[in-house]
């Protein structure tokens, strides 16, 4: 390949279904030697589409590996034949040692067998002719249970080695690199699952703990990574496949964008809110305009958001304390809809990390709650026991138990569950409440927080959902319903480290009342 001309390189691109890159490679006069010398940054500048970037980098890497110790063929067709032969051999090895043949669970980033299941972007992966070759090419990209971080560029590695807090531009570089790496493992799909986002962010923070700023770094990096994927998907948002995916997951629900008249009405309403609530100075007015502009961006500057939210905390607390309507407050400070910002505001008010506390509660008390006398025959508990029979993975079982614990809390304490969580019904209460869909399916489960009968935010898991529910009551100074007081007393007792509650287990209750299980 080192001796290839520009024409030979272009011929090779066509053979690899990358014909769209030919014109650009001809313009830049990329010969074989130049092709092998390309680094990640050069590929990003040379190739527009992220899927093509990932495939091209992978092909170059594969070629270098296959030609080590061998003389590079001068004919590109011979080189392609060598690569295809190696790929076929890899695929046969993969088939014989595939975990699926031994009943093992597939890792979260293992490429799906059905590559046309609606999540693959057809514009990125065109002319897919041979699924086996794609699986063979991705053999080197199969993940173990724990995600392995990619090799970062030199300047990023220097910054990480010095443990310096990255600035905004450096954060974007890290996120761009992680997103490109994820796209390779996902075979060009631009729709990672929640678990895949969690795997990547957890690996980043475990390798570089200093990036976990104030204990909230997980949400910060995960949000930034999601925003990056949204940004990459933007050029294809009019594609039929993307539109179907959006409809499937409830995006816009078929509504059109706001008209100019509606936008103008909102602007007038904001002016009225400012005049009625408090005396706004020019600096605060600038913050509010910045929030509203930043909120609609795909890639957000979360460090600047944190800074400005801290600067406006005092006036925001005054407005909430003076009973300014919550809808008006959320128009002025739209980032309060984000769970991460709610958690941060809660921490500023109470000096307590509510997410960590909530996770600890669900992990520590799930066994006691699920075996308590009051919920042993609850339909949720029965469904949980049935679902658990189909899984052996410890992480999956733990997640399912924590989810059931979250849903059953009001039943354990004799409170009204309809004020806490709604399943398969329309939200009727005005106080904060959770809406849950498919709770025991990690891939498609959905938790939404509602406030005043309108969806405030959608979250990914039961820990974030429960933490957001508790935080909403405190951040917005909403009085807890009397029929939910015992449940919140339990949660707040543990969140604020007051004392440990006691649960009568099923076995203890049986001893007290001589309870007998019905024979089955």
Curated annotation (Swiss-Prot):
Alphabetized CDD domains for the sequence: SAM_Samd3 (cd09526)
Pfam family membership, one: SAM_1
Disulphide-bridged cysteine pairs: none
Chain intervals for the UniProt region annotation (Disordered): 85-114
Domain SAM per the UniProt entry, residue ranges: 4-71
SMART domains xrefs: SAM
SUPFAM superfamilies recorded: SAM/Pointed domain (SSF47769)
PROSITE patterns in the record: SAM_DOMAIN
Coiled-coil parts of chain: none
Gene3D superfamilies the record matches: Transcription Factor, Ets-1
PANTHER family: STERILE ALPHA MOTIF DOMAIN-CONTAINING PROTEIN 3
Record protein name field: Sterile alpha motif domain-containing protein 3
